[in-house]
Amino acid sequence: YLSHPNMQTPKSGKIYSCNEGAFNSFPEPVKQYINHCKDNNYSGRYIGSFVADFHRNLFKGGIFLYPQTKKDKQGKLRLMYECNPLAFIAEQSGGMATDGINRIMEITPTHIHQRVPLFIGSEEMVSKAKMFIEAYEAEQPQEEVNQTSKA
């Protein structure tokens, strides 16, 4: 039973959802993207429930991001049973889901509890976050890029 048949996620939105309490431990390009959101008067909405935050952004347009941090260097959310199911829903409704670079649905798991960073929601917003990450990595010497992707 679908509550909203043929649902489509807006291509863009004005909501970003992330735990800003961890802002200081986010990679630099993620900080830049969040500052971009603030500079453009996007609304920060984060209640700490992945499914609830994703659901709101699915209907209203927005991005949910849970990047890697200094503490969780590979990300915190599990690929197989947290990221993949919602990435499937996002893509089926016209949205997008990446680990910052790679499409979530194309990541081959290395183990059942594998953790990954997640950027999921409206296509234009996820693409913009990905652009910030790619631009930052392109500017860095190769050894720093390797540290950034692991930090």
Language-model features: locations:
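IMPase-like, lithium-sensitive Mg2+-dependent phosphomonoesterase catalytic core
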Residues: Y1-A151
